[in-house]
Amino acid sequence: MDLNPRAAENARCRAAIVEGISVPVGASEAEVLARAEQKMKRGGISVGSLHFRLYKKSVDARKREDIRLVYSVLATAPEGHRGFSEEVLARLGAKPYRDLDLQIEKGTAPLPARPLVVGMGPAGLFCAYLLAKEGYAPILIDRGDAVADRVAAVDGFCRDGRLDTESNVQFGAGGAGTFSDGKLLTRINDARCAWVLETLRRMGAPSDIILQAKPHVGTDVLRHVVQNMLDSICDLGGEVIYRCRLDGFDRHPDGTFTAKTTKGDILCGLMVIAPGHSARDTYKMLLGKQMMLEAKPISVGVRIEHLRRDMDTMLYGSMAGHPDLGAAEYHLSDTKGERGVYTFCMCPGGEVVAAASEEGTVVVNGMSCRARDGLNSNSAVAVSVRTSDYEPVDGSLVLGAIAYQRRIERAAYLAGGADYSVPVQTVGDFLDGAGDRAIHAPTRVMPSYRGGAYYRLAPVNQTLPDYICDSLRYGLRSFDRKVKGFAMPEAILSAAETRTSAPVRILRGADYCAVGCPGIYPCGEGAGYAGGITSAAVDGIKVAEAVISAYGPN
């Protein structure tokens, strides 16, 4: 894909982003736009013919007594306008805005059969969508269910503890992100991110995801977005198959593959493997095919829950509850100790979800609806795990990484009573000198896992290694110094958070093909090339571009 300006004068001149417009909470849109106009005027720019609109919005809560909203504004000049000097814009704290198109030059090599995309998470979805949009008629498969059936399976597990290992919080339409906060924030600097957001908006996501600096969709809305995207893939000539797990494949002399699936054999011209970070049997199958995989560092830990109103007050003080602020968010980290500790996937007004995908394990994750108005707020508190912490299994460090996760998940299952209840401990007990005992039952903050009905008091160190527990204690105390009250004794810890990222990477080359395996394209978070919805979607786009640039449409 070439991300080129539509016209030279557009790139250089016709639009600018005016940054750093700080206003009090409650300021009107008109006031924000007026400040942008004033900023342009101070640079000697005539604003009479310019069009101004809000571009990005963020909350600056570094000072609780003076919380500010910080905006960027897009200023656009009409046709025929002389435009803006980049030198002048730089002095103003502004920058040129480049209206970018997604332009892909198609290859000419014949594709011997339709492309197969394995996995319906963000990477697989966006890869299949772009392939379908460009006329390649992909086949998209997932081991799990369609959205509605998947929601029913997850609800059933929460209600009665019957786990469907093929359709759950990890597997099915939309991937693990379907049961999350639907965060779209990413740290990658790639112009494709804007294309991802715009596509999600067209598929039914709220329009404010374009404006917000920390956009989120919410699990309730994201489910509809995923279904709309799948429908669009079919409308564009693609095919979607559920309950279709990839168990193996054969390569043929003519360059085609036969994918061995639970729905039978599928002939394809290439395979995009976007399995998600929990497809452990897929990793093992790929190892058996002599593909090159490597273990990578991960993080493990717990979910911490506070009352949402407490967290709002901790971060926003007297401004807590203001409609311009919403439920408070945080991201905390400390790398000064023995291991890095950080919060991850913070879910304001959300719940802790039962995220197991294998029998006899307990895994936790977080989820919020669009409104973020639940009783509790939660986040992972995770500790860095090094590859040196893994013990090889059958001579494989990749299998050792998976075994490391499984040991913790199995320990959490046993600590919870072996009925898919979650082991919980108050922060007070965990930080106490007798942290190996869970003495105090939850009182002020109640666990939200499986509706709050299935939990058991158990010390965190029954689930996690001592070196992880020591780092968690260090991290909680550090975070409490940054956000007073974070380590309040009544807060609840639920174990175990183990699926923060993929424990392995499927090696690929500059052509995006797996090393030594032309025609197989590892993709997304499960392949080790992304972390989160937006970056996984971007990686799916990149892989689709690689396919499109190499082959002509079917």
Predicted segments, located by residue:
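Residues forming the flavin
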Residues: D2-I67, L74-N554
